[in-house]
Amino acid sequence: MYCNIKWLNRSLIYYGGAMSSMNTNERIVPLLPLRGVLVYPTMVLHLDVGRDKSIQALEQAAMDENIIFLAMQKEMNIDDPKEDDIYSVGTVAKVKQMLKLPNGTLRVLVEGLHRAEVVEFIEEENVVQVSIKTVTEEVEADLEEKALMRTLLEHFEQYIKVSKKVSNETFATVADVEEPGRLADLIASHLPIKTKQKQEILEIISVKERLHTLISIIQDEQELLSLEKKIGQKVKRSMERTQKEYFLREQMKAIQTELGDKEGKGGEVEELREKIEQSGMPEETMKAALKELDRYEKLPASSAESGVIRNYMDWLLALPWTDATEDMIDLAHSEEILNKDHYGLEKVKERVLEYLAVQKLTNSLKGPILCLVGPPGVGKTSLARSIATSLNRNFVRVSLGGVRDESEIRGHRRTYVGAMPGRIIQGMKKAKSVNPVFLLDEIDKMSNDFRGDPSAALLEVLDPEQNHNFSDHYIEEPYDLSKVMFVATANTLSSIPGPLLDRMEIISIAGYTELEKVHIAREHLLPKQLQEHGLRKGNLQVRDEALLEIIRYYTREAGVRTLERQIAKVCRKAAKIIVTAERKRIVVTEKNVVDLLGKHIFRYGQAEKTDQVGMATGLAYTAAGGDTLAIEVSVAPGKGKLILTGKLGDVMKESAQAAFSYIRSRAEELQIDPDFHEKNDIHIHVPEGAVPKDGPSAGITMATALISALTGIPVSKEVGMTGEITLRGRVLPIGGLKEKTLSAHRAGLTKIILPAENEKDLDDIPESVKENLTFVLASHLDEVLEHALVGVKQ
């Protein structure tokens, strides 16, 4: 609603006594709601009216002395206001002129008459009418009122001089007004205040109170204008200083150009300064960077230190300080990506989905620090990349294998020639975001020497309570790593220091079963190798039984790395046949695998074909997963020597001695000659002799093999066993049960004897493996012997 405001210089209706010469009884008049415009009594202005009900109200007023009630809406965006949407106090006005415009709207000239209050809201079909009653002003006409009028005029005059938004002619018009109420209304209309405040002034009946209110409002406006003026002066001075600096720098450039000095760094410094200010780095870091920049500006370009500082500035600006990728908080989609890239590995996938779920609820969770432990080839590194994809995060990998210098992690101090940041800061630069998935690969392969311990430097990186303030020796300023999701990989935990291990969440990844390997080969390895060797699915078909043949007789691993190499070999052979023999299709079956890969490399099935005396099959946990361990015992006449061979470690030797002592203490019960240790030499050998072996879990296996050799009772070829033995014959729990069980399954064993306390670990073993194995839970060696020795009553 547009308006042109004009004020009458005469008192049309009232002032000085009664408010109006009109009938003060209640009367019904049409309502014209106003949006963002307020009309005071005696005000004349143009209004553009376009709403249907408003046009109908004007037409209704034309039939009844052109009288209409003007009331302001509380909210401007309401097109059809109801009773609660308009203010109850408004102005009765007279329509002086009405003109219809080409666009269908009406332009009307109205003149405010007096204040009125709505008594009843009457809404009809096409028009809204209101029952109103006249509001009479409270005029006292005393000396205080005159003093207030004079004070108001003085403040208004000062306001006009400062603001320069009101003309002197307007002030002259205002100064001629003698009625206090009209004076207050006239000044209120010229003040740049909100319409809500203007409505409040309209609703004030007491003229004195209205004058007081306006004096207070003008004083507030004067203070605001004074503050604006001060701020403007500060801005002006700042701009003048900036312009002066710019002018001087331009002069310096011109002088350098005239002198032929090409080493001036003015433009470069300004560019660096702008980049620093826009980088988003913390305030303290920014101060340090600007301080270094000032040093750089003063140094000659030929100075060696100038190059050091410039390199430092480049590193600071290359780091991500605020840039972050938005996490994909879609559990279903993330799970789909993880399942597509990797088969199995449910624990890791579940942990990632748990992190996403908590992140969705809190949006403030620190990045987890995971450590994936498992044998080579099970997909630890590639899984970390899939985690990054599922989270929609950038991925960066740092290999820690062979790192033995603490400066590799923390960087070198800038005082050294060729100093650089450590691998963590270098990785963050590559990541280009503050929340990447950061892979610390082969964390168990670090070592230490006289230059420091890199694993100790990682303690700060992998501590959620400290890594928000990580300090690199080169950067020398704190860098926030708390939003990074660290994923470490290791083949074994034994070489990782305890404090570092304590900071990580360990997730063990055991080897794959045969069925899992077949699935991985079918869905992932074979399509990849076909593509790399230029073959199509129609050129080479590998049946499942052929894949199983390759897994059993050409690989002996927990992962699938060797399996992939063997499949690649099959593809190469097939490619050669297709090119030379011009055959378009090759089908690999169980029978022709030997033609492509040659003779079997490994023997699948039972370690021994017959039950043997003095030989028992143990289960071992290695860096490559699990494996079977044949333990041989030979008894020969001698002087009671106990010989241990097979490159055994101290713990394994002590297990053999504990088993030997247990058998001596129960020789009669076991039906063994009590003096056997004096008349015989006993030799325990654990092949392969060149491979180091250690650990307590072969205790019951050595005890069983010893008893078998001393009693002449053979050990069942179908049984594998694992467990630590005590001098009392108790069987203690061991670790790595899943890996050991998978190795027993690969070897074709059908029965496994394990400590009773390891029963809880059976849940981790795949059902496809459990179906083919019988588990015997033993708490004492007697139970082991019942199931391991052939012919012993159970």
From Swiss-Prot:
PANTHER family: ATP DEPENDENT LON PROTEASE FAMILY MEMBER. Belongs to the peptidase S16 family. Keywords: ATP-binding, Cytoplasm, Hydrolase, Nucleotide-binding, Protease, Serine protease, Stress response. InterPro entries: AAA+_ATPase, ATPase_AAA_core, Lon_bac, Lon_bac/euk-typ, Lon_lid, Lon_proteolytic, Lon_Prtase, Lon_prtase_N. Pfam families: AAA, Lon_C, Lon_lid, LON_substr_bdg. Residues 610-791 form the Lon proteolytic domain. The active site is at S697, K740. SMART domains: AAA, LON. ATP binds at G374, P375, P376, G377, V378, G379, K380, T381. Its EC number is 3.4.21.53. This is Lon protease. The gene is lon. It is found in: Cytoplasm. One of its GO terms (biological process) is protein quality control for misfolded or incompletely synthesized proteins. It comes from Bacillus thuringiensis (strain Al Hakam). Residues 29-222 form the Lon N-terminal domain. It catalyses: Hydrolysis of proteins in presence of ATP. GO terms for molecular function: ATP binding; ATP hydrolysis activity; ATP-dependent peptidase activity; sequence-specific DNA binding; serine-type endopeptidase activity. It is an enzyme of class 3 (hydrolase). Homohexamer. Organized in a ring with a central cavity. Induction: By heat shock. ATP-dependent serine protease that mediates the selective degradation of mutant and abnormal proteins as well as certain short-lived regulatory proteins. Required for cellular homeostasis and for survival from DNA damage and developmental changes induced by stress. Degrades polypeptides processively to yield small peptide fragments that are 5 to 10 amino acids long. Binds to DNA in a double-stranded, site-specific manner.
